[in-house]
Structures are given as structure tokens and as C-alpha cells.
Amino acid sequence: MCIRDSLDLAWRLCRGVVSNAILLVRDGMLVGLGSGQVSRVDACRGAVEKARQFQGASGATGAVAASDAFFPFADGPQVLLDAGVTAIVQPGGSMRDAEVLADVDAAGAAMLVTGTRHFRH
């Protein structure tokens, strides 16, 4: 499965998950899920932890991530990048979108901005 298909799958799955939602997909399979957290960075940590719990120490390596709402700061994506995520899809809309995108780009990863939120309570 190519990165584009993985991002599409992660984005579609993200619609049905309780906010704040972060999903990790690798090889056509959901490998990590962080949801229902108060902060987006905690949801990122939860998704990475679940990936490691069920896939081993390198659980998130090579995965892509989806977020149901924008990243207000670069700390959430940094958690994902540090775990080995290669691409992130998110709706955008933060005042700091340019900063977050620049940080992801500088790390050598890709970020796709959809313009559509899945965030809900």
C-alpha cells in the first residue's frame, strides 16, 4: 500500500473516532489509536504507545498519521515524527499552520492539509 492510500485510509477511519483523535496506519492496517484525550499531544502519545504495545518497539516506524483537527503547536507532530511517522494528514486551520508545516518539512516528513475537520465532542 502506498503512502497516499495509507493516508486516505487513516483519514477515513478518523471520522468515526472520538476527538481528540490520532490514528496511525501502516501496511493497510490501523496500528495505533489515541482518542478522547484533553490535549492533541496526549492523543499522539497514546497512539504511539498503542502502536508499540501491539507492534513492538518500532510500532510507529514507517506509519502515517491522521488527526481529526488541526495541530495548534508543533509538539504533537514532533511526538509522531520522533516515533518514526513519515506523513501526517490533518485539516489545518491553526494560526500556527505555517510553523507546524515547516517543522514537519524540516524533519523530512510530509503533511497533507485537507481543509475539512472531523473533530467532534
Locate predicted features:
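C-terminal binding/interaction regions
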Residues: F73, Q78-H121
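Glycine-rich, charged/polar anion/phosphate-binding loops
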Residues: L7-W11
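Conserved small/polar residues in nucleotide/adenosyl-binding loops
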Residues: M1-S6
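Glycine- and Gly-Pro-enriched alpha-helical subdomains that act as flexible
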Residues: L23, M29-P77
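Short, small/polar residue-rich loop motifs at catalytic or cofactor-binding pockets
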Residues: G16-S19
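General beta-strand structural signal in soluble alpha/beta enzymes
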Residues: A21-V25, G32-L33, S67, V89-Q90, ...
